[in-house]
Amino acid sequence: MDSKESLTSPSEEIPSSVHGQERGNVMDFYKTRRGGATVKVFMPSPSLGGSSQSDSKQQRLLVDFPKGSVSNVQQPDLSKAVSLSMGLYMGETETKVMGNDLGFPQQGQITLSSGETNLQLLEESIANLNRSTSVPEHPKISASVAVSAALLKKELPETPSDVSSEQQNLKGQTGTNGGNVKLCTADQSTFDILQDLEFSSASPGRETNESPWRSDLLLDENCLLSPLAVEDDPFLSEGNLKEDCKPLILPDTKPKIKDNGDLILSSPKNVPLPQVKTEKEDFIELCTPGVIKQEKLGPVYCQANFSGANIIGNKMSAISVHGVSTSGGQMYHYDMNTATLSQQQDQKPIFNVIPPIPVSSENWNRCQGSGDENLTSLGTLNFSGRSVFSNGYSSPGMRPDVSSPPSNSLSAVGPPPKFCLVCSDEASGCHYGVLTCGSCKVFFKRAVEGQHNYLCAGRNDCIIDKIRRKNCPACRYRKCLQAGMNLEARKTKKKIKGIQQTTTGISQETPENSANKTIVPATLPQLTPTPVSLLEVIEPEVLYAGYDSSLPDTTWRIMSALNMLGGRQVIAAVKWAKAIPGFRNLHLDDQMTLLQYSWMFLMAFALGWRSYKQASANLLCFAPDLIINEQRMSLPFMYDQCKHMLFVSSELQRLQVSYEEYLCMKTLLLLSSVPKEGLKSQELFDEIRMTYIKELGKAIVKREGNSSQNWQRFYQLTKLLDSMHDVVENLLNYCFQTFLDKTMRIEFPEMLAEIITNQIPKYSSGNIKKLLFHQK
């Protein structure tokens, strides 16, 4: 039996009809106020008047059974017929109770075996129809209702005029419903077809031992079918017979929880109709009326909520899911995440998940409490004797000692391994200021002290790892410098270690001496940093030129690469100058003027230092990936300029300048040129310059230790600072020439071009004052 059936409340006179592609007979069972049953038979009759053809495609025949006319009906057959009509007979696997109107299948064929059983009441009751009404017979009655139509054709006359006159007379009568003909008067008693049905005596809102079918209908009109009564039936909607059941918006059916944990049974007016869907695959079969809903909280819980008498003492009715029958109070919670639903939209869900219904604040505060702590979801609702699992699935059949393993179990592990910053091998310690392995430590020491001239055969981008670290020494050495390896870091470490040992030795004392006297250390370690120590911290790192050594070397390529590298070095020099103690106290215009006058001093002196430390003053190490050797120096316009720059590195090599001396001399070169009219913060400038002159003297004393040679070395170092003016003057002249000569097509970065543009007029006018230590 493939049909769609729905039950309506007695308080509403909404007929169920089938609006499909094919019209057939439709039967509606109305619950009257007298407890009887009313049968409506819809038959197509287009032979009526043309004025009523549009809205009278289906005429309704209202049949009211008197109590005496059906006294000989057998009760067992009546019970079976009613149970079949209600759609709750579970023997038929194809029966569907959906949210659409009540109707028979489109085939509409009622076999003789089932028709005689279901329409046995009609055979005896329709015999009295010829006495009270007359309905025209349509000549083209559908074959889909052959049995029922044949029974009606024997009793109904074929006079269309009688129907028209009867309808006109009944339009103004009070006992009619639209165009329906009411055969029985109001004072006639009707046959109660529900009196012998075995329904549960318990009903929501009533006592347990009182049957709802014996209630006074005049006092409580909704008590007859209270478990199925709703104020607004959402299932009585028009739709095609072939349409699937869509999720419906139902009233809020969330279980109400008392303070003691018991469920509050909902009132009959608030319990919705069941939505039972039995597929061919038998995914789910609900043996008791229930609804499927979605909670308001984050996770979506699908659960069958049972009404009224089905929940007594926390005992749940049985549900069969995938062939697994549950009984004895078992309850299954299906915890589905909303994200999972969105990801699996192409799959057919077992449950029709219904969107959450907004609940008014008054009902929520009255039933659930006023605070967020009273929120209760089905996934966390525990009944006595039930074990709840972490995934929301609860069943008493599982052992209580079974527990899920911890999700994030951290095993006791040691410290993470340390890797070399150069070749990614396992590091053996901190060497030359960088965490490296022993192999890279030895390589860097030999590369610096051996004064090797490494050249990359590729593009200075070779991969340096544990296996290929010996393939390209140039790229390996470049990566060592990039990581920050420095030979001076080893000396600094030894000094710090010596200071710590000295402090520890002074602070140690015997117990007997400590009891008698308090020892004050003779020399305390200096807590405030010195200017030289700050200069070591702010020293800029080595930059790369990005020069492609695989292409042929030309003057244009090398000069353009040097200019691009110089632009980045100027930016680094600006940041370095602002970090010098006292420099930012100068006027902003003075800061800009000093940087514009000294940018070439800073780059040339730093180039000489790198060449002195890495190439023994034989090569010019502009960058780890751009080293000017003798072959590149022989290019046009290159030798004269390289000769001036090699002079600086050779002097540093000859004097064996220390790193602290280099830092002080570099700072003094920043303060070596001023305008002729002076600076706006001239006094502060002189004070800062004198401070670093004294720091240079301290560095000399620290290096020599013998006061007899300190003045001689100070003279040599300051003489080198004076000679830097001649070197920078020659370099600036060539730089200005290449900048102004557009035929050479030498590229200049934007910032460097702006500095040169502002500096050319000042040098041309001679508005520069050189601050020299010695007279020429």
UniProtKB/Swiss-Prot annotation:
Which biological process terms from the Gene Ontology are attached to this UniProt entry? cellular response to glucocorticoid stimulus; cellular response to steroid hormone stimulus; chromatin organization; positive regulation of transcription by RNA polymerase II
Q: Where in the cell is it found?
A: Cytoplasm; Nucleus; Mitochondrion; Cytoplasm, Cytoskeleton, Spindle
- For whether the record's keyword set contains Translocase, the answer is no
Q: Which residues carry this modification: N6-acetyllysine?
A: K479, K491, K493, K494
> Which segments carry the region annotation Hinge?
486-522
Swiss-Prot/TrEMBL keywords: Acetylation, Chromatin regulator, Chromosome, Cytoplasm, Cytoskeleton, DNA-binding, Isopeptide bond, Lipid-binding, Metal-binding, Methylation, Mitochondrion, Nucleus, Phosphoprotein, Receptor, Steroid-binding, Transcription, Transcription regulation, Ubl conjugation, Zinc, Zinc-finger
Q: Where is this region: Disordered?
A: 1-25, 157-178
Name under which the protein is recorded = Glucocorticoid receptor
Origin species = Tupaia belangeri
Gene this protein is translated from: NR3C1
